[in-house]
Amino acid sequence: MVQSSVLGFPRIGGQRELKKITEAYWSGKATVEELLAKGKELREHNWKLQQKAGVDIIPSNDFSYYDQVLDLSLLFNAIPERYTKFDLAPIDVLFAMGRGLQKKATETQAAVDVTALEMVKWFDSNYHYVRPTFSHSTEFKLNTAAGIKPVDEFNEAKALGVQTRPVILGPVSYLYLGKADKDSLDLEPISLLPKILPVYKELLQKLKEAGAEQVQIDEPVLVLDLPEAVQSKFKEAYDALVGADVPELILTTYFGDVRPNLKAIENLPVAGFHFDFVRVPEQLDEVASILKDGQTLSAGVVDGRNIWKTDFAKASAVVQKAIEKVGKDKVVVATSSSLLHTPVDLESETKLDAVIKDWFSFATQKLDEVVVIAKNVSGEDVSKQLEANAASIKARSESSITNDPKVQERLTTINEALATRKAAFPERLTEQKAKYNLPLFPTTTIGSFPQTKDIRINRNKFAKGQITAEEYEAFINKEIETVVRFQEEIGLDVLVHGEPERNDMVQYFGEQLNGFAFTTNGWVQSYGSRYVRPPIIVGDVSRPKAMTVKESVYAQSITSKPMKGMLTGPVTILRWSFPRDDVSGKIQALQLGLALRDEVNDLEGAGITVIQVDEPAIREGLPLRAGKERSDYLNWAAQSFRVATSGVENSTQIHSHFCYSDLDPNHIKALDADVVSIEFSKKDDPNYIQEFSEYPNHIGLGLFDIHSPRIPSKQEFVSRIEEILKVYPASKFWVNPDCGLKTRGWPEVKESLTNMVEAAKEFRAKY
């Protein structure tokens, strides 16, 4: 009998219960006991759901109140000293590391003011992890102040009658994905391996004592280009960890091709391996060849990253091939990765078109898929499920919903001229200086302003038909005016309208484009309590009418200052949607580029001549390995942006924005935007600024962290700008936050932006 396995399940709850209780706790409206009780309830639901579905190997320790990598940092005492000074409870230390903390002094507690650790993309997904941060003084040990999470949750499931397989990020990946703290920049995190291995060993021993038979130990860095010095660390690590006193270890990889690093793991004494055969089915032969007698092969054939139904025939064929290689008793049918990246349950979608809905599979449905495939390759009768699945796959492939001949014809018109501005940047800059007459250190924001409760209530009322379109438009215009007047009052130079009409920077556009489908409850965790509801690209994309012109024109009409039109770029819309799996990413991005070109041209025609096209996801789409696939991606990603933005006059200023990523200036240069803004506030490495010293166009390196409620002082802004100006010329530098202000409250936004503008004014006086 071939077993079924799931690598992880969404932690957020079917109705976003985790977000609600976490934010209630942060705001003082829920106790820590209520927070912990809700977490326990969510874990129990997930375990019971998987047990009921018939999944054989059920994960534990896949739950987190914020981020699973951050959990490990807390557990292993990798806590920078600045978070240990305030006598905080363990859960509050966790949240302070994840989002920063600023509290006024009370009679019983000193004031707290700490910034968050850096948050970066989890490989090429839209999930973000909190980056482990190490120093020479880091002392690894099991931090048992709040228990031992992997052991406690294993025992919790065991008490419910559910035998689970704990999930832990492996030591090589944990260190390699971390960074040196600002006081230890000469430290190579991987050099800490000998210090951390005894702590891993102790944790594994405690899991064995609790009754764990296997542990899923994730080493996803194996899909990256690893230096030989890092490759050699796997043998060192697993020779030290494996033994009779610890559970069996299943070394787990996902998101890519392991073959270039195969030598690093071919002789490891682990009980088995997991590989992603959704992303790289062609690696099966080579990875199977390294298995020794007794080692199992976990075959990731159900996509943990997308929402399309698994083709049972194709997936079963892959598993059957694995069985032929290593034997039926040594193969496990599994999800390709954790299901963290998919919505919880398709059954909660009551408004989806029935035809389209039949093409989808969310996390709950994927449980059934791994079970059916396992039964099928084991010889059990699942003919009804196979027939229904085949019919669904066939219907989608033949549907007219996916094909628009006009869009396909327009794609053929794209050439280099269409994707090139009328003049090079120096000539454009001359015209833009004459037109806008901006001061040195021009100030702006990235786009969104706080999405208040009042905004959400009125948007909901409009969606339900409780207020008219005229009433809703009047409300939105009032919100826009509030944002504009505030920006004028504090002296910002280039304004935004605040985006009160937008629910999400991708969904808002997807809802107005042909070729998209939408969910009502298809939430996925992006980071912490930030969840997104990605649109689904189901067919060829086009723009039937203008999407943003009305609000931008109104905003410009009430101010004499330049007003930015705000759009989300083609690659970001693609990356932050669930994409089609039947056509290439390049085709989808270029279709989006053409649709956005129409919008950019309409904005310019309506008098909006500063236009920002955000591409925060362009880095995350970069293939994980160097080579032709990566260079091809960079070419079509930049081309799709230029297709969108190259139809304007020289005097129209094109901006773009990037966040959550380590960026190569050459990637940005290829976009040929006039001004770019980049998340920067949590970058501690001075070399990162140096990389942009030769960037030819204008740039704004983000000066404060919008993911944290913490308010930076004017002096903090001044110090940050001084550091940047040691490397980057004042004549090209813009002053702005890291990202949009949607998730922040008005009081912190007002104070932070006021301090930022005052700092810019101080530098104008100096220069």
Curated annotation (Swiss-Prot):
Enzyme class, spelled out: transferase
Binding site for Zn(2+): H657, C659, E679, C739
Residues given in the record as 5-methyltetrahydropteroyltri-L-glutamate binding sites: K19, N126, D504, Y527, R530, Y531, W576
This protein's pathway: Amino-acid biosynthesis; L-methionine biosynthesis via de novo pathway; L-methionine from L-homocysteine (MetE route): step 1/1
CDD domains given in the database record: CIMS_C_terminal_like (cd03311), CIMS_N_terminal_like (cd03312)
Annotated InterPro entries: Cbl-indep_Met_Synth_N, Cobalamin-indep_Met_synthase, Met_Synth_C/arc, UROD/MetE-like_sf
Outcome of substituting Y660 to A/Q: Loss of catalytic activity
KW tRNA-binding (keyword) present: no
Outcome reported for the amino acid change (mutating R459A): Less than 5% of the catalytic activity of the wild-type
Cofactor, how bound (note): Binds 1 zinc ion per subunit.
GO biological process, any: 'de novo' L-methionine biosynthetic process
Effect of Q451A: Less than 5% of the catalytic activity of the wild-type
Regulation: Inhibited weakly by methotrexate.
Binding site for L-homocysteine: I446, G447, S448, E499, D614
Cofactor(s), by name: Zn(2+)
Catalytic activity line of the entry: 5-methyltetrahydropteroyltri-L-glutamate + L-homocysteine = tetrahydropteroyltri-L-glutamate + L-methionine
A GO CC annotation given for this chain: fungal-type cell wall
NCBIfam families according to UniProt: met_syn_B12ind (TIGR01371), PRK05222.1 (NF003556)
Protein name (database record): 5-methyltetrahydropteroyltriglutamate--homocysteine methyltransferase
High-level lineage: Eukaryota, Fungi, Dikarya, Ascomycota, Saccharomycotina
Name of encoding gene: MET6
